[in-house]
Amino acid sequence: MYSLLKANKIANEYEGEKFILIESFKFANASYERTAKKPMVDRASGKAVRGITYTPDFVSEHFIIEVKGRANESFPLRWKLFKRLLHNNNDTRVLYKPQSQADCKTVVEDILKRFYNGNV
């Protein structure tokens, strides 16, 4: 994707923005949890729970691109939370999630048509 964007002189930043999907917080309640080799005990009371962030591959003022060959287990939920964040913040950038070289070429063609009047 990087080489296609560069070859077509499409302005972007690689991992240029980090989005906070869920803020970190302190969990005050008791939370009895088991780990692989340890018994079930209160593991969370008073401890910080890490936030959830998302950093797309390529960003610009017009679009966001996440190149995904195979999504890991957490990606579908993270992607939904990301879309919700964009919606709630009235972010109107176009989202692209190509999964193959052919998809990447289609994305570049669409970006050129939408934002560069078909050329650079």
Can you describe what each PLM-predicted range is?
Residues M1-V120:
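Electrostatic, structured charged patches in enzyme active sites and in nucleic-acid/phosphate-binding
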